[in-house]
Amino acid sequence: MGKRQDWSVTACIFLFLSLASQIHCRSHIPFPSPKRGVSSSGDTSHFNVIQRESVPSPKDKDLIQQLPGQPSDVTFKQYGGYVAVNKPAGRFLYYYFVETIKPGNTTPLVIWFNGGPGCSSLGGAFKELGPFRVHSDGKTLFRNPYSWNNEANVLFLETPVGTGFSYSNSPINGKQGDKATAEDNYMFLVNWLERFPEYKGRDIYIAGQSYAGHYVPQLAQIILHRNNQTLINLRGILIGNPSLNREIQDDFGYKFMFSHGLISQQQMDNYNKFCTDSDLYDWDKCHLASQKIEAQKTHLDIYNIYAPLCLNSTLSSEPKKCTTIMKADPCSGNYLKAYLNIKEVQEAIHANTTKIPYEWTSCNTKLLWEWNEKDRYVSLTPILQELMGKGVRVMLYNGDVDLVIPFTSTLAVVKTMNLTVVKEWRPWFTGGHVGGFTEDYKGNLTFVTVKGAGHSVPTDQPIHALNIFTSFIRNTPLPQTA
């Protein structure tokens, strides 16, 4: 009797396991499709169908469905969001990415930095080389036909932490500087490429302007030093109106003003006599001479000495009729600030998700003034020469009416590199007109001036800027004939 009970128990357990196994298998093995002409509705009504929702990837989450106020003729994809560069410290950099209007598996990736330090690359995106500009109402956008995404995929990065929408959850110990920024920028790029792996094998160019004369070569150097860890196919760097060596470049501002009739011969002579002549140097007289020259700047746009000042910062109730993008609006910065502080805009571009307790501004002046002073004056020419020695092409371009970083100051820095000229100074052309002048040096460095442009070349001369950019990434000479 005991054996029979044991057998019964064993049989029950076996039956239970058998049924459980069948149920388990049914949940994993799909049922065959019903035969043609036979309805399956009656056969499966007793089953509960469980549907699992797919979880969007970080890339999919960053997809911008539509920018508020954007034109209707947009065919390219846009992305925006945050990438962690130091999770334990809670440091996140914000990016805005526009794919090219001509998608392809080989179209290059360009990373763009504005300067400052502490100035947002969204200024570059919406005032310079991106696909849109902001109307005077601060609410709507219009197309920029000379956007660089005509030729490449363009990634705009707000860096360093504290710039624009980028933030840190932990206090930053000490002053920010070049080294930490370069590390953050490198970590951003590595992590961003994991989010967008289709760009890992692409040709990559790093570009920027002003203080990006530090960011760009320093990031490029880290990439080359660590390419045995993470391969990044860096092809070249392109920097506009670059800050490369302030000890040299700072001496050219007053000379530039004098050469353009902005100060008198007497003012220039007094400055030279009391400030630069070691035998006649007099601090009090030098200070007075400098003050008189600085006073002349108050009447000028120092970023483009021939541009009008913004005299009315009030937004218009309706967007002004835009007759041509070639005429830069001196108040465009006000329009952009208004646009990026609209709640719906921030939600659309996945920015300010942590509700930063301050509004977006084009430049963080606190960060600017607290930047490591030694870093401001470091010379970047040794890094440029290292990059060139490893096959990285370098182009430096400069607007010829910029007072902040005159083209003469950039050219002076290039001359200190003692490079051999392989193609002498000559004009280059856009649409039959002189776009500026250019000179080529041994080691793959090209210097370009841009006629009629100031500190932000793509703002002042968008056609010229696009031609320079296209020439660079295609590795073709600028047009040499009208």
Swiss-Prot record:
Disulfide bond entries: C119-C363, C275-C286, C310-C331
EC code: 3.4.16.-
Active site per database record: S210, D402, H455
Subcellular location field: Secreted
Entry-listed glycosylation sites: N228, N312, N352, N418, N444
UniProt note on tissues of expression: Expressed in seedlings, flowers and siliques.
Keywords recorded for this protein, A-Z: Carboxypeptidase, Disulfide bond, Glycoprotein, Hydrolase, Protease, Secreted, Signal
InterPro entries: AB_hydrolase_fold, Peptidase_S10, Ser_caboxypep_his_AS
A single GO cellular-component term on record: extracellular region
Residues of the signal peptide: 1-25
GO biological process terms held by the UniProt record: proteolysis
Family named by the database record: Belongs to the peptidase S10 family.
Primary role: Probable carboxypeptidase.
Name of the molecule in the record: Serine carboxypeptidase-like 36
